[in-house]
């Protein structure tokens, strides 16, 4: 493993599990000093314990004051943030559980040659579910970026990697709120990148395809095989593959990437 990130301070939101956990491990393996920020402090502590060194802190990214406090904690304990990975997210699990039975009926009807069951995901979506995903994904990405840039800008250096999704590129059936939030992150990334590069801060995004995480295993068991079957690569992605993409963007190897979106997705989307 190369040490491209030696001595860099990296703050990873949603660092307590799944893709975020893999990102923490990969950045640490490349020499970074990692702060795992997560809404679950025990989960973040477990990740840092496994790494062997670093900082674990609790944060609700939808709370701007909590974000400011968490970034201040990182800078107080570890020094200025060199790398920020805005990875914290949610999929609206209650919504997924309601829509999954309809998806299964649609698959059966498609096999029979005629679809008669509408998803009606949009009209079933509550105000609370819509706002929750916007708060976690969009508000959280903005709050964390703003907090980190306050110190990055006067130092004239820094890297920010935002976690989007192929759902933000082309939309995902049954998830209008998630798709809208992830598309918003892509727009925010492009705008912030153009503004901040003149201050020496690079901003880019990663838009993964479907990744084999515990969240997918717990909510979409029946759909996982169908997703893998329609992916040209024939399988789901792994958290480690997404983490490798993040590590590249965080390194000087990606010095000419500004406002870019890298999409490791197994061929589901080939034009980004």
What are the functions of these language-model segments?
Residues 150, 194-195, 255:
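Alpha-helical segment proximal to the catalytic Tyr-Lys
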Residues 165:
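Residue(s) in the substrate-gating loop at a strand-loop-helix junction
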Residues 2, 89-91, 170, 247, ...:
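Short C-terminal tail/terminal secondary-structure segment
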Residues 145, 181, 189:
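Active-site helix of classical SDR
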Residues 90, 101-142, 157, 161, ...:
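Catalytic Tyr-X3-Lys loop
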Residues 3-35, 192:
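Canonical Rossmann dinucleotide-binding motif of NAD(H)/NADP(H)-dependent dehydrogenases/reductases
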Residues 41-42, 59-71, 90, 127, ...:
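The beta1-alpha1 cofactor-binding region of Rossmann-like NAD(H)/NADP(H)-dependent oxidoreductases
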Residues 197, 202, 257-259:
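Short, small/polar-rich loop/turn modules that mediate ligand/substrate recognition or access, typified
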């Amino acid at each position: 493993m190369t040490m491209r990130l030696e001595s860099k301070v990296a703050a990873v939101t949603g660092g307590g599990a799944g893709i975020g956990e893999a990102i923490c491990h990969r950045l640490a393996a490349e020499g970074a000093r990692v702060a795992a920020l997560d809404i679950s402090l025990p989960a973040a502590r477990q990740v840092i314990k496994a790494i062997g060194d670093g900082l674990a802190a609790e944060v609700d990214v939808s709370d701007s004051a909590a974000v400011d406090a968490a970034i201040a904690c990182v800078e107080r304990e570890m020094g200025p943030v060199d790398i920020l990975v805005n990875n914290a997210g949610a999929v609206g699990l209650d919504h997924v559980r309601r829509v999954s039975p309809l998806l299964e009926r649609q698959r059966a009807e498609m096999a029979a040659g005629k679809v008669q069951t509408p998803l009606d995901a949009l009209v079933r979506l509550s105000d609370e579910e819509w706002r929750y995903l916007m708060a976690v994904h969009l508000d959280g990405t903005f709050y964390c970026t703003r907090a980190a840039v306050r110190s990055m800008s006067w130092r004239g250096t820094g890297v920010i990697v935002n976690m989007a999704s192929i759902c933000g590129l082309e939309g995902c059936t049954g998830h209008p709120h998630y798709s809208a939030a992830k598309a918003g992150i892509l727009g925010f990334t492009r705008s912030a990148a153009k503004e901040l590069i003149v201050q020496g801060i690079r901003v880019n995004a990663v838009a993964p395809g479907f990744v084999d995480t515990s969240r997918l295993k717990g909510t979409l068991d029946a759909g996982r095989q169908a997703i893998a079957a329609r992916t040209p690569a024939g399988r789901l992605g792994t958290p480690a593959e997404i983490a490798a993409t993040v590590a590249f963007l965080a390194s000087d190897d990606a010095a000419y990437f500004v406002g870019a979106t890298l999409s490791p997705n197994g061929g589901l989307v080939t034009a980004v």
